């Protein structure tokens, strides 16, 4: 596998994202990278891929170039490998938030949420409680279709369709969280960081985020206490606990996630339809 896939984010105050955009675009193109870099007043969120030499050069650029004023000097990257480029083009986008929650009072760049690392979380889940004896509840902050690909055992899943719904569902389900240690998690850490800050802001105690998200957990401890794969937003569709592309795919017709089991259905036609969008399925639901 010759392509290195990098993902990272960091909350940091950026005064003028528009001034950064042409410089970041130029450097990414010069390095032959493809993917997406999001710039917002609250920070950076990126998914890029390229050769080892060029991704290493990109990491050095982000950490050390004077443009960034040292804001990302300690930026940590999650890495996986693939045999082909997962992205079709290079985009640097300006956004209001690097992950949309529509809660402007939440400012992660002013202070991180408490976090738990993967080995500690595994230890808690092995025992069924944290170091103080409180039961541990895993809270999935991802969208429902992502959760369906895989999640932690017995995780709370409120079936949200977009992250901006998270504050409302938490208010509706506070009773699920009282008296427990809550560990919010997501793919790479960005959503669960905002989620943890929001929960603390509304008075929910003993809240943590999973440091580095599911992918970092896979990297450090494998798939313990996790079932299924982890959905990712590129051609690989999902990664297994060994951080290898799984057999899960997306329907060419409707972009629904199609598990290996669903691919056995006669309604799944590669490159055309799946059980969600096949005409026979639609007719049955309408009946």
Curated annotation (Swiss-Prot):
GO terms for biological process: tRNA modification. SMART domains: RHOD. It is an enzyme of class 1 (oxidoreductase). The active site is at residue 186. Keywords: Oxidoreductase, tRNA processing. It catalyses: uridine(34) in tRNA + AH2 + O2 = 5-hydroxyuridine(34) in tRNA + A + H2O. Pfam families: Rhodanese, UPF0176_N. Residues 132-226 form the Rhodanese domain. GO terms for molecular function: oxidoreductase activity, acting on paired donors, with incorporation or reduction of molecular oxygen. Its EC number is 1.14.-.-. Belongs to the TrhO family. Catalyzes oxygen-dependent 5-hydroxyuridine (ho5U) modification at position 34 in tRNAs. This is tRNA uridine(34) hydroxylase.
């Amino acid at each position: 596998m010759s392509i290195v896939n990098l993902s990272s984010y960091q909350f940091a105050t950026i005064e003028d994202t528009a001034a950064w955009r042409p410089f970041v675009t130029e450097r990414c193109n010069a390095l032959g990278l493809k993917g997406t870099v999001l710039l917002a007043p609250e920070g950076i969120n990126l998914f890029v891929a390229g050769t080892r030499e060029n991704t290493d050069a990109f990491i050095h650029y982000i950490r050390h170039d004077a443009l960034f004023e040292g804001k990302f000097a300690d930026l940590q990257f999650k890495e996986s490998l693939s045999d082909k480029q997962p992205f079709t083009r290079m985009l640097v986008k300006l956004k209001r938030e690097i992950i949309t929650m529509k809660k402007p009072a939440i400012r992660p760049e002013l202070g991180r949420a408490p976090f738990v690392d993967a080995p500690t979380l595994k230890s808690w889940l092995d025992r069924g409680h944290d170091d103080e004896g409180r039961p541990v509840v895993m809270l999935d902050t991802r969208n429902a279709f992502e959760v369906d690909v895989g999640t932690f055992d017995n995780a709370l899943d409120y079936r949200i369709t977009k992250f901006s719904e998270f504050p409302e569902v938490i208010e509706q389900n506070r009773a699920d969280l009282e008296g427990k240690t809550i560990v919010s998690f997501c793919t790479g850490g960005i959503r669960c960081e905002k989620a943890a800050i929001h929960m603390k802001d509304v008075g929910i105690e003993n809240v943590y985020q999973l440091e580095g998200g599911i992918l970092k957990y896979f990297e450090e401890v494998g798939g313990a206490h996790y079932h299924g794969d982890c959905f990712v937003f590129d051609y690989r569709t999902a990664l297994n606990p060994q951080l290898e592309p799984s057999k899960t795919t997306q329907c060419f017709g409707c972009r629904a996630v199609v598990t290996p089991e669903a691919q056995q259905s006669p309604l799944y036609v590669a490159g055309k339809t799946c059980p969600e969008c096949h005409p026979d399925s639609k007719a049955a639901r309408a009946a």
